[in-house]
Amino acid sequence: MLHVCGMPYAPILAPSLLAGDHANLAASARTVSEAGVSWLHLDLMDGHFVPNLTFGPETLAALRRAGCQLFFDTHLMLSEPQRYIEAFAKAGANLISIHIEPTYDHEVTLARIRALGCQCGIVLNPGTPAEAISHLVDQVDLVLVMTVQPGFGGQPFRRDMLTKISQIDQWRRERGLKYRLEVDGGIDLATAAECRAAGTDTFVAGTSFFKSANRREFAGTISQMQ
């Protein structure tokens, strides 16, 4: 399989475009680059799996046309992600993560993402136990643990997810796997430190990043976490 990184896992910040300026997404993406960050997290919502609507493949394509060269960490919060992965891959996604909760063939969809030239990830909502993805972790490049209920930004961090994070981190150590372990929801410098201690290496931050007085310093603090 294609691994995103090797051990040890250096921390990565993936600012969420959902918290950017929706009237000028390209400018928000440039803000990420100017902070010295290489990843951009894109939340794609269909209004069915989660009660909100956000971006589509054309958003990714438009950002690429505008010259954005960031690594697109693409999170599909869709009831039928298998219908759209090709469109997102063609639009410029680098990594496509899908949720375990909807009913579809997860293994086939992950393999299809890989066949399209993208890295693949699996996502769990707060109410979904880690065991639900145990059979898939050897097939992915990233596991994303939601630390809020997905759908809207700005929610408070759920500390009860730290145990789940630790369990998924333990699996990769015990099984010799190299997937990245990402968290999304209520992430600021304090909660990122808690997640780092539990085994997280990839941090989605929206409001806390874009509203930071010094985004470069914010990003640097994340990248230097031990």
Where are these regions (language model features)?
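Active-site beta-loop-alpha junctions enriched in small/polar residues
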Residues: 16-20, 45-47, 77-81, 101-103, ...
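Conserved anion-binding
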Residues: 24, 69, 80-87, 93-180
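Conserved, mostly hydrophobic/aromatic
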Residues: 25, 32, 43, 88, ...
